[in-house]
Design a protein with these regions (language model features):
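Short acidic loop-to-helix transition motifs that present clustered carboxylates
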Residues: 112-116, 173-179, 202, 376-379
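N-terminal small/polar loop signature for handling phosphorylated ligands or for N-terminal nucleophile
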Residues: 69-158, 163, 301, 306-317, ...
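Small-residue (G/A/S/T)-rich helix-start motifs and N-terminal tracts that mark the onset
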Residues: 1-85, 90, 94, 193, ...
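Internal gly/pro-rich beta-alpha loop/helix module
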Residues: 127-128, 133-234
Length: 536
């Protein structure tokens, strides 16, 4: 799904009304109803008892009044707070404010600091706070009572000992977050969940402050999907289930192991044999028909014992226990690579100069699609432009920000300041696909197209997670090929994050192990298939 900026979103709303005859009031009604449903879903089977709906004077506030109307029959106490004088409301927002009052809804006006101070103790003691203050129409920074409200809300404790509020839900976007990707220019509300409408907003995906969004959900309110594609002029897409509907995720009953490719993984060294095991296991669990793990002979027994289902191949070792250059002598490595579908290189191979030369040579000389990660990337530090001289048409590099900084000769801070630009520039420069890992991983193709992934959690911030991702990307390439490689790679990143979510449903993310992420890949894939089936 395309991500839109604020101007594009306004245009979609306008055309939905003018071209397709959907009244703007109906769009607001649908938006508010979705907000109410999201709140109630979050608390099934125990409904929240106290809800505070914070409304600004614009259409975002109007959405909030609609949501309040739908919610009021399901809770013990619900109060709406209007951060404006009623006469400042216009259009659909004014209509829904009146409907809220006519339904018997309670409204507290917040027009001065004293009013906010008096209301705050009650708001701080609610189960749910709905943020309908500013929305996507923000220009400049939040000020006045809204700025104070954001500051106070951000100070609320969210730990197990003081669980209120259980949910802070942003309507369309967190108050204070610009929609077009820039950093917030003032106070920014950090929420548990954001329910946005029609399409994700660019800022929710790529802003340096995007973590404020929490869990992002998108709900349609009546605008045709084709209109989003028509109006959106950018190449930024959100990696969501619909993007993968065209891939053969469900296997044919008469398929066999040869139908799903053969991954060759060059990985591991003394002290880093686990990286090879993790990547190899992930490739198997992610669906590759066959997997061969090529490792230095000194760690071959450990890697062989790590998983019964993959095959292994010994690589000649340096004195340091890493892959030696003499693996290139004769046909030794050529025979190992013969008959394989994809080559994945890098997890745990080490940074010995001789090993790095071996890595550079096999990457530049193979005609197989290549997934290059970890120490494999470090082999090209200071020599990254040589990747353009490779034989294979298909190269995917998977750096974290530090590795990308070394490849591009920039600081990590520079990379993080504009992650999309860094990934797009690298993809163009090396004529490669780039998976720039981190919060909201970027997947960029050499033609400028970009996916942003929002699945995953902080449990992935642990050693071995990248090795698992390498295995997943290689396995999906083996299964689905390179005709739609950007989409296939985006699927891999999506499943990696979704597996982390599945593995931590009943546990804290701090204890998540990379191997547990690998084990949850089938669950993530099943979830995706079922969601696509549900959508029809």
């Amino acid at each position: 799904m395309k991500a839109l900026n604020a101007a594009e979103m306004r245009e979609v709303d306008r055309l939905t009304t003018e071209r397709f005859g959907v009244p703007s009031l109906k769009l607001m009604e649908a938006a508010g109803k979705h907000v109410a449903e999201a709140v109630l879903r979050a608390f099934v089977p125990d409904l929240p008892k106290k809800i505070a709906v914070l409304c600004g004077k614009g259409n975002n506030g109007g959405d909030g009044f609609v949501a309040a109307r739908y919610l009021q029959k399901n809770v013990t106490r619900l109060c709406a707070y209007l951060f404006a004088a009623p006469e400042e409301l216009r259009g659909d927002a004014a209509i829904n404010f009146k409907r809220w009052q006519e339904s018997g809804g309670q409204v507290t006006l917040i027009q001065e600091d004293a009013a906010w101070g008096a209301a705050w103790p009650e708001i701080a003691n609610t189960d749910v706070i709905v943020d309908a203050l500013l929305g996507t129409g923000l220009r400049g920074a939040a000020t006045g009572q809204i700025a104070q409200a954001i500051t106070d809300l951000n100070g609320l404790s969210r730990n197990a000992a003081a669980p209120r509020p259980a949910l802070i839900l942003a309507v369309d976007t967190p108050s204070g977050l610009p929609s077009d990707g820039e950093r917030a220019d003032g106070p920014l509300l950090r929420v548990h969940k954001t329910l946005t409408f029609t399409a994700p907003k660019i800022g929710q995906l790529i802003s340096p402050d995007a973590a404020a969004v929490g869990l992002l959900e998108v709900r349609g309110i009546g605008s045709p999907a084709a209109l989003i594609e028509e109006v959106g002029k950018g190449t930024l897409r959100w990696a969501e289930p619909e993007e993968f509907a065209g891939l053969p995720l469900v296997r044919a009953a008469d398929s066999h192991k040869g139908s799903f490719g053969h991954v060759l993984l060059v990985a591991g060294s003394v002290g880093k044999s686990g990286a090879a095991v993790l990547a190899g296991r992930a490739a198997l669990i992610a669906g590759s028909g066959l997997v061969t793990v090529a490792v230095p002979d000194g760690v071959l027994p450990a890697v062989t014992a790590g998983q019964a289902e993959y095959m292994t191949a010994p690589l000649r070792s340096t004195n340091a226990g890493t892959a030696a250059l003499r693996n290139l002598e004769g046909q030794y490595f050529t025979e190992i690579a013969s008959g394989k579908t994809v080559l994945a290189v890098g997890p745990g191979v080490g940074t010995q100069a001789e090993t790095q030369e071996f890595i550079r040579t096999i990457v530049l000389q193979t005609e197989l699609p290549v997934v290059l990660d970890a120490d494999g990337l470090n082999a090209f530090a200071g020599k990254a432009d040589s990747m353009r001289e490779r034989k294979t048409k298909f190269l995917c590099v998977t750096p974290h920000p530090g590795e990308m900084a070394r490849l591009l000769g920039l600081s990590s801070a520079k990379i993080q300041a504009d992650r999309v630009q860094a990934a797009v520039e690298a993809a163009r420069r090396w004529n490669a696909h780039v998976v720039l890992k981190g919060f909201h991983t970027i997947v960029a193709g050499p033609n400028g197209a970009v996916f942003v992934n929002t699945t995953g959690n902080a449990g992935l911030a642990k050693g071995g997670s990248g090795d698992v991702l390498t295995g997943i990307l290689a396995a999906l390439t083996a299964q689905f090929g390179t005709d739609e490689w950007l989409r296939v790679l985006a699927l891999g990143v999506y499943l990696h994050g979704s597996a982390a979510e599945a593995a931590t449903e009943k546990t804290d993310v701090s204890g998540l192990l990379a191997g547990e992420v690998a084990e949850a890949i089938p669950q993530a894939r099943q979830r995706l298939v079922r969601e696509l089936q549900r959508r029809g």
